[in-house]
Protein backbone atom coordinates (compact mmCIF):
# COMPACT_ATOMS: atom_id res chain seq x y z
CA UNK A 1 0.00 0.00 0.00
CA UNK A 2 1.22 3.47 -0.86
CA UNK A 3 1.65 5.94 1.99
CA UNK A 4 -1.09 8.46 2.28
CA UNK A 5 -0.36 11.76 0.64
CA UNK A 6 0.31 14.75 2.77
CA UNK A 7 -2.39 17.31 3.08
CA UNK A 8 -2.00 20.26 0.75
CA UNK A 9 0.59 18.57 -1.48
CA UNK A 10 -0.74 17.06 -4.69
CA UNK A 11 0.46 13.70 -5.80
CA UNK A 12 3.16 14.17 -8.46
CA UNK A 13 4.10 10.59 -9.11
CA UNK A 14 0.93 9.51 -10.91
CA UNK A 15 0.86 12.67 -13.02
CA UNK A 16 4.49 12.34 -14.11
CA UNK A 17 3.98 8.86 -15.51
CA UNK A 18 1.76 9.72 -18.52
CA UNK A 19 3.63 12.92 -19.27
CA UNK A 20 6.90 11.08 -19.32
CA UNK A 21 5.46 8.47 -21.64
CA UNK A 22 3.96 11.19 -23.86
CA UNK A 23 7.24 13.07 -23.98
CA UNK A 24 9.09 9.88 -24.83
CA UNK A 25 6.61 9.05 -27.58
CA UNK A 26 6.88 12.61 -28.90
CA UNK A 27 10.65 12.35 -29.13
CA UNK A 28 10.33 9.06 -30.96
CA UNK A 29 7.79 10.54 -33.38
CA UNK A 30 10.07 13.51 -33.98
CA UNK A 31 12.93 11.22 -34.87
CA UNK A 32 10.72 9.19 -37.20
CA UNK A 33 9.39 12.33 -38.89
CA UNK A 34 12.91 13.68 -39.32
CA UNK A 35 14.02 10.44 -40.86
CA UNK A 36 10.95 10.40 -43.05
CA UNK A 37 11.56 13.99 -44.13
CA UNK A 38 15.13 13.09 -45.00
CA UNK A 39 13.99 10.05 -46.99
CA UNK A 40 11.18 11.89 -48.81
CA UNK A 41 13.30 13.50 -51.57
CA UNK A 42 15.00 10.21 -52.28
CA UNK A 43 11.70 8.39 -52.54
CA UNK A 44 10.17 11.06 -54.77
CA UNK A 45 13.21 11.07 -57.06
CA UNK A 46 13.15 7.33 -57.44
CA UNK A 47 9.43 7.39 -58.07
CA UNK A 48 9.86 10.08 -60.72
CA UNK A 49 12.68 8.21 -62.44
CA UNK A 50 10.66 5.03 -62.48
CA UNK A 51 7.60 6.73 -63.98
CA UNK A 52 9.34 8.57 -66.82
CA UNK A 53 10.40 5.52 -68.89
CA UNK A 54 6.96 4.06 -68.45
CA UNK A 55 5.41 7.19 -69.95
CA UNK A 56 7.91 7.13 -72.84
CA UNK A 57 7.07 3.51 -73.57
CA UNK A 58 3.40 4.34 -73.59
CA UNK A 59 4.02 7.21 -76.04
CA UNK A 60 5.97 4.89 -78.36
CA UNK A 61 3.21 2.29 -78.24
CA UNK A 62 0.71 4.98 -79.18
CA UNK A 63 2.70 6.72 -81.94
CA UNK A 64 3.66 3.59 -83.92
CA UNK A 65 0.06 2.49 -84.59
CA UNK A 66 -0.93 6.08 -85.37
CA UNK A 67 1.72 6.39 -88.10
CA UNK A 68 0.83 2.94 -89.42
CA UNK A 69 -2.85 3.86 -89.66
CA UNK A 70 -2.00 7.17 -91.35
CA UNK A 71 0.06 5.35 -94.01
CA UNK A 72 -2.74 2.89 -94.71
CA UNK A 73 -5.20 5.77 -94.89
CA UNK A 74 -3.01 7.57 -97.46
CA UNK A 75 -2.79 4.43 -99.61
CA UNK A 76 -6.57 4.03 -99.42
CA UNK A 77 -7.11 7.66 -100.47
CA UNK A 78 -4.73 7.22 -103.43
CA UNK A 79 -6.62 4.12 -104.60
CA UNK A 80 -9.95 5.93 -104.35
CA UNK A 81 -8.59 8.91 -106.31
CA UNK A 82 -7.15 6.54 -108.93
CA UNK A 83 -10.56 4.96 -109.46
CA UNK A 84 -12.09 8.40 -109.94
CA UNK A 85 -9.54 9.31 -112.61
CA UNK A 86 -6.82 11.01 -110.60
CA UNK A 87 -3.17 10.03 -110.42
CA UNK A 88 -1.01 10.32 -107.28
CA UNK A 89 2.76 10.59 -107.68
CA UNK A 90 5.66 11.27 -105.34
CA UNK A 91 8.20 12.23 -108.01
CA UNK A 92 10.33 15.29 -107.48
CA UNK A 93 10.14 18.15 -109.95
CA UNK A 94 12.70 17.53 -112.66
CA UNK A 95 14.24 20.58 -114.25
CA UNK A 96 15.22 20.30 -117.88
CA UNK A 97 18.85 21.28 -118.31
CA UNK A 98 20.63 21.36 -121.62
CA UNK A 99 23.93 19.62 -121.12
CA UNK A 100 26.81 20.82 -123.22
CA UNK A 101 29.34 18.36 -124.65
CA UNK A 102 32.11 19.96 -122.57
CA UNK A 103 30.13 19.25 -119.41
CA UNK A 104 29.64 15.64 -120.50
CA UNK A 105 33.39 15.29 -121.06
CA UNK A 106 34.12 16.72 -117.61
CA UNK A 107 31.61 14.35 -116.02
CA UNK A 108 33.18 11.31 -117.62
CA UNK A 109 36.68 12.54 -116.84
CA UNK A 110 35.84 12.85 -113.14
CA UNK A 111 34.33 9.37 -113.16
CA UNK A 112 37.51 7.93 -114.67
CA UNK A 113 40.28 10.12 -113.28
CA UNK A 114 42.97 7.46 -113.47
CA UNK A 115 41.94 6.03 -116.85
CA UNK A 116 44.09 8.23 -119.12
CA UNK A 117 46.32 10.93 -117.68
CA UNK A 118 47.64 12.08 -121.07
CA UNK A 119 44.12 12.58 -122.33
CA UNK A 120 43.28 14.75 -119.35
CA UNK A 121 46.38 16.89 -119.89
CA UNK A 122 45.54 17.36 -123.57
CA UNK A 123 41.97 18.19 -122.66
CA UNK A 124 43.05 20.92 -120.24
CA UNK A 125 45.54 22.30 -122.78
CA UNK A 126 43.05 22.30 -125.65
CA UNK A 127 40.44 24.16 -123.62
CA UNK A 128 42.44 27.35 -124.16
CA UNK A 129 42.07 28.58 -127.76
CA UNK A 130 45.51 30.21 -127.78
CA UNK A 131 47.18 26.95 -126.84
CA UNK A 132 45.19 25.12 -129.50
CA UNK A 133 46.27 27.60 -132.21
CA UNK A 134 49.93 27.38 -131.19
CA UNK A 135 49.78 23.60 -131.16
CA UNK A 136 48.22 23.53 -134.63
CA UNK A 137 50.95 25.85 -135.94
CA UNK A 138 53.65 23.63 -134.43
CA UNK A 139 52.13 20.54 -136.01
CA UNK A 140 51.93 22.30 -139.39
CA UNK A 141 55.60 23.35 -139.18
CA UNK A 142 56.72 19.86 -138.22
CA UNK A 143 54.75 18.33 -141.09
CA UNK A 144 56.33 20.74 -143.60
CA UNK A 145 59.97 20.32 -142.45
CA UNK A 146 59.77 16.52 -142.16
CA UNK A 147 59.08 15.09 -145.62
CA UNK A 148 59.34 11.51 -144.40
CA UNK A 149 56.67 11.96 -141.78
CA UNK A 150 53.41 10.19 -142.58
CA UNK A 151 51.45 13.37 -141.90
CA UNK A 152 53.01 15.32 -144.80
CA UNK A 153 50.78 15.21 -147.88
CA UNK A 154 53.75 15.26 -150.32
CA UNK A 155 55.43 12.15 -148.94
CA UNK A 156 55.25 9.28 -151.45
CA UNK A 157 53.41 6.22 -150.32
CA UNK A 158 52.16 7.75 -147.13
CA UNK A 159 49.52 5.53 -145.59
CA UNK A 160 45.98 6.77 -145.44
CA UNK A 161 45.00 7.77 -141.95
CA UNK A 162 41.79 9.27 -140.69
CA UNK A 163 43.72 12.39 -139.74
CA UNK A 164 44.21 13.75 -136.30
CA UNK A 165 42.19 16.75 -135.20
CA UNK A 166 45.41 18.72 -134.87
CA UNK A 167 46.46 18.45 -138.52
CA UNK A 168 45.19 21.46 -140.53
CA UNK A 169 44.97 19.73 -143.90
CA UNK A 170 43.15 16.64 -142.69
CA UNK A 171 39.47 16.25 -143.31
CA UNK A 172 37.23 16.81 -140.33
CA UNK A 173 36.26 13.23 -139.54
CA UNK A 174 34.30 12.68 -136.37
CA UNK A 175 35.01 9.60 -134.34
CA UNK A 176 31.70 7.99 -133.53
CA UNK A 177 31.78 6.50 -130.07
CA UNK A 178 29.23 5.91 -127.34
CA UNK A 179 31.57 7.19 -124.64
CA UNK A 180 31.81 10.99 -124.38
CA UNK A 181 35.50 11.65 -123.89
CA UNK A 182 38.56 13.08 -125.62
CA UNK A 183 39.65 10.73 -128.40
CA UNK A 184 43.31 9.97 -129.01
CA UNK A 185 43.03 9.11 -132.70
CA UNK A 186 45.93 10.03 -134.96
CA UNK A 187 49.15 8.86 -136.52
CA UNK A 188 49.74 5.75 -138.59
CA UNK A 189 46.78 3.50 -137.90
CA UNK A 190 44.76 1.31 -140.17
CA UNK A 191 41.36 1.93 -138.62
CA UNK A 192 39.68 4.75 -136.79
CA UNK A 193 40.29 3.30 -133.35
CA UNK A 194 40.44 5.25 -130.12
CA UNK A 195 42.91 4.05 -127.51
CA UNK A 196 40.48 4.81 -124.72
CA UNK A 197 37.59 3.07 -126.48
CA UNK A 198 39.70 -0.08 -126.90
CA UNK A 199 40.10 -0.47 -123.14
CA UNK A 200 37.61 -2.89 -121.65
CA UNK A 201 37.57 -1.00 -118.40
CA UNK A 202 35.98 2.01 -120.08
CA UNK A 203 32.35 2.01 -119.06
CA UNK A 204 29.97 3.83 -121.32
CA UNK A 205 28.20 6.42 -119.26
CA UNK A 206 24.88 7.46 -120.66
CA UNK A 207 23.87 10.93 -119.51
CA UNK A 208 20.58 10.75 -117.70
CA UNK A 209 18.20 13.06 -119.53
CA UNK A 210 15.44 13.50 -117.02
CA UNK A 211 12.67 15.45 -118.59
CA UNK A 212 8.96 15.85 -118.30
CA UNK A 213 8.19 14.20 -121.60
CA UNK A 214 6.19 11.45 -119.94
CA UNK A 215 4.08 14.10 -118.25
CA UNK A 216 3.60 16.18 -121.36
CA UNK A 217 2.71 13.15 -123.45
CA UNK A 218 -0.45 12.66 -121.45
CA UNK A 219 -3.02 15.02 -122.84
CA UNK A 220 -5.49 16.65 -120.49
CA UNK A 221 -3.39 16.13 -117.36
CA UNK A 222 -4.03 18.85 -114.77
CA UNK A 223 -2.37 19.10 -111.35
CA UNK A 224 -5.06 19.35 -108.68
CA UNK A 225 -2.91 19.19 -105.53
CA UNK A 226 0.82 19.63 -105.02
CA UNK A 227 2.36 19.30 -101.55
CA UNK A 228 6.13 18.95 -101.75
CA UNK A 229 6.86 15.84 -103.79
CA UNK A 230 3.29 14.57 -103.55
CA UNK A 231 1.14 15.42 -106.56
CA UNK A 232 -2.44 14.66 -107.49
CA UNK A 233 -3.21 15.07 -111.19
CA UNK A 234 -6.44 14.67 -113.12
CA UNK A 235 -6.18 12.39 -116.13
CA UNK A 236 -8.88 12.03 -118.76
CA UNK A 237 -10.00 8.52 -119.52
CA UNK A 238 -9.38 6.99 -122.92
CA UNK A 239 -13.11 6.60 -123.45
CA UNK A 240 -13.54 10.37 -123.40
CA UNK A 241 -10.84 10.85 -126.02
CA UNK A 242 -12.38 8.11 -128.16
CA UNK A 243 -15.79 9.74 -127.85
CA UNK A 244 -14.32 13.06 -128.93
CA UNK A 245 -12.64 11.43 -131.91
CA UNK A 246 -15.88 9.70 -132.85
CA UNK A 247 -17.76 12.99 -132.57
CA UNK A 248 -15.18 14.70 -134.76
CA UNK A 249 -15.44 11.93 -137.34
CA UNK A 250 -19.26 12.09 -137.27
CA UNK A 251 -19.24 15.85 -137.78
CA UNK A 252 -16.82 15.42 -140.67
CA UNK A 253 -19.06 12.80 -142.29
CA UNK A 254 -22.11 14.99 -141.80
CA UNK A 255 -20.30 17.83 -143.51
CA UNK A 256 -19.53 15.58 -146.45
CA UNK A 257 -23.07 14.22 -146.54
CA UNK A 258 -24.43 17.75 -146.45
CA UNK A 259 -22.54 18.54 -149.65
CA UNK A 260 -23.47 15.31 -151.40
CA UNK A 261 -27.25 15.77 -151.79
CA UNK A 262 -26.70 19.18 -153.32
CA UNK A 263 -25.26 17.68 -156.51
CA UNK A 264 -28.22 15.38 -157.41
CA UNK A 265 -30.64 18.27 -156.99
CA UNK A 266 -28.65 20.34 -159.43
CA UNK A 267 -28.50 17.44 -161.84
CA UNK A 268 -32.27 16.95 -161.63
CA UNK A 269 -32.79 20.67 -162.20
CA UNK A 270 -30.62 20.49 -165.30
CA UNK A 271 -32.26 17.32 -166.62
CA UNK A 272 -35.89 18.42 -166.00
CA UNK A 273 -36.21 21.01 -168.82
CA UNK A 274 -34.35 18.72 -171.18
CA UNK A 275 -36.96 15.93 -171.17
CA UNK A 276 -39.97 17.94 -172.54
CA UNK A 277 -37.89 19.25 -175.41
CA UNK A 278 -36.95 15.76 -176.46
CA UNK A 279 -40.60 14.60 -176.31
CA UNK A 280 -41.72 17.59 -178.44
CA UNK A 281 -39.18 16.84 -181.13
CA UNK A 282 -40.26 13.18 -181.24
CA UNK A 283 -43.96 14.18 -181.67
CA UNK A 284 -43.10 16.53 -184.56
CA UNK A 285 -41.14 13.83 -186.30
CA UNK A 286 -44.01 11.34 -185.90
CA UNK A 287 -46.56 13.85 -187.27
CA UNK A 288 -44.42 14.53 -190.29
Swiss-Prot record:
User: In which residue ranges is the amino acid composition biased (Low complexity)?
Assistant: 152-172
Region: Disordered, residue numbers: 145-172, 237-288
Q: What is its main location?
A: membrane
- Entry's transmembrane regions: 58-78
Which segments show compositional bias classed as Basic and acidic residues? 237-246
Specify the signal sequence span: 1-23
- Give GO BP annotations, semicolon-separated: positive regulation of p38MAPK cascade
Query: Any idea where this protein resides?
Result: Cell membrane
Keywords from UniProt, A to Z, are: Cell membrane, Glycoprotein, Membrane, Signal, Transmembrane, Transmembrane helix
The residues exposed to the Extracellular compartment are 24-57
Q: Check the record and name the Pfam families matching this protein.
A: RELT
How does the protein's chain sit in the membrane according to the entry? Single-pass type I membrane protein
Q: Which residues lie on this side of the membrane: Cytoplasmic?
A: 79-288
GO CC field: plasma membrane
Q: Does the keyword Metal-binding apply?
A: no
Carbohydrate-modified residues? 25
Q: Which family does it belong to?
A: Belongs to the RELT family.
Q: What is this protein called?
A: RELT-like protein 1
Q: Which species?
A: Gallus gallus (Chicken)
Upper lineage is: Eukaryota, Metazoa, Chordata, Craniata, Vertebrata
